[in-house]
Amino acid sequence: MRIVLQVVSRASVTVAEETVGEIEGPGLLALVGLTHTDTPETVSRLAGKVAGLRILPGETSCADGPSPVLAVSQFTLYGDVRKGRRPSWSRAAPGQQSEPLFEAFVAALRERGIPVRTGRFGAHMEVSLVNDGPVTVLVDSDELDRPRRG
């Protein structure tokens, strides 16, 4: 599971000229990618990490506020560009596997008291945001399993 987090002062998602999700910050835009090996345990662990990261103004977390999160599914986070000029999406989990896991991620954040808005799963979306900082952090479940260096 990969999540690109951006601290925002506001963000919104539009599908077919309809705003389907928006937040006023400070908050986080979370672009969420899932792969074949992700499980409900992976989702729960990363939801806890996202909720507790102290990257908002004043070194606070979403759980402290609570501050809102706009969660947007993004399979392209698992694009493989090692060969040729067209990315391969084979490392991204298919929709029937990733949609329930994405919904579980959203539910896990809400269970922690965090207000969450979402895009529309599988739709072509326009995401608008105003970065605050800018602060952008990549959270990768594979990296969390590795030992820390130095």
Swiss-Prot record:
One GO BP: D-amino acid catabolic process
Motif mapping: Gly-cisPro motif, important for rejection of L-amino acids: 133-134
EC class name: hydrolase
Keyword Amino-acid biosynthesis: no
One Gene Ontology MF term: D-tyrosyl-tRNA(Tyr) deacylase activity
Catalytic activity: glycyl-tRNA(Ala) + H2O = tRNA(Ala) + glycine + H(+); a D-aminoacyl-tRNA + H2O = a tRNA + a D-alpha-amino acid + H(+)
Transmembrane segments: none
Subunit annotation: Homodimer.
Organism: Kocuria rhizophila (strain ATCC 9341 / DSM 348 / NBRC 103217 / DC2201)
One Gene Ontology cellular component annotation held by this UniProt entry: cytoplasm
Phylogenetic classification of the source organism: Bacteria, Bacillati, Actinomycetota, Actinomycetes, Micrococcales
Domain notes from UniProt: A Gly-cisPro motif from one monomer fits into the active site of the other monomer to allow specific chiral rejection of L-amino acids.
Record keywords, A-Z: Cytoplasm, Hydrolase, RNA-binding, tRNA-binding
Keyword RNA-binding part of the UniProt annotation: yes
Protein family (similarity comment): Belongs to the DTD family.
Cellular localisation: Cytoplasm
Protein name: D-aminoacyl-tRNA deacylase
HAMAP family: Deacylase_Dtd
EC numbers: 3.1.1.96
Chain's role: An aminoacyl-tRNA editing enzyme that deacylates mischarged D-aminoacyl-tRNAs. Also deacylates mischarged glycyl-tRNA(Ala), protecting cells against glycine mischarging by AlaRS. Acts via tRNA-based rather than protein-based catalysis; rejects L-amino acids rather than detecting D-amino acids in the active site. By recycling D-aminoacyl-tRNA to D-amino acids and free tRNA molecules, this enzyme counteracts the toxicity associated with the formation of D-aminoacyl-tRNA entities in vivo and helps enforce protein L-homochirality.
